[in-house]
């Protein structure tokens, strides 16, 4: 099929959601159980397998993949592509170079951001908050997070 596909990963405390995206649309989707107390390094091979399966199901190869984004449930430094702090989930994440992981495995750029911030950006760009300049979102799952859009800009 070919194209400019991206992978979106929502790293939850109990479930990891992985979507294959083309032109801002989810074309394939899967979930895997998270064993977050064992750490992120324990989950990376399972995430790799899930991503490769999505590519295979879509009939494309990794050369059609242009980026991977990961929503992390904790404090991150997106510029340095590093997890800064975790909340008793994925405790080893601060020691993992996720940009290197994505580059060495698929040869694509990797974007890391806080999960609540990405959730509010998604609603602001595509969902219920589309067209508004100020949005506050609280995410409640295994943990609690907040994301804010202020004067049409994500608050960081």
Task: Label the predicted regions.
Residues 2-49, 83-85, 154:
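Short glycine-rich, Thr/Ser-proximal phosphate-binding strand/loop in the N-terminal lobe
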Residues 6-10, 65-69, 135-139, 145:
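Short glycine-aspartate micro-motif
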């Amino acid at each position: 099929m070919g194209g400019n596909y991206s992978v979106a990963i929502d790293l939850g405390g109990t479930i990891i959601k992985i979507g294959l995206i083309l032109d801002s649309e989810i074309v394939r989707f899967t979930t895997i159980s998270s064993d977050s107390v064992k750490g992120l390094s324990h989950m990376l091979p399972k995430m790799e397998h899930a991503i490769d399966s999505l590519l295979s199901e879509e009939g494309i190869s990794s050369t059609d993949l242009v980026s991977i984004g990961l929503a992390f449930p904790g404090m991150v430094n997106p510029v340095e592509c590093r997890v800064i702090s975790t909340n008793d989930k994925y405790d080893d994440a601060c020691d993992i170079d996720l940009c290197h992981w994505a580059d060495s495995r698929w040869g694509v750029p990797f974007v890391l951001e806080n999960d609540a911030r990405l959730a509010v950006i998604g609603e602001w760009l595509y969902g219920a908050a589309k067209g508004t300049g100020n949005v506050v979102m609280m995410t409640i799952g295994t943990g609690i997070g907040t994301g804010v859009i202020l004067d049409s800009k994500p608050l960081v």
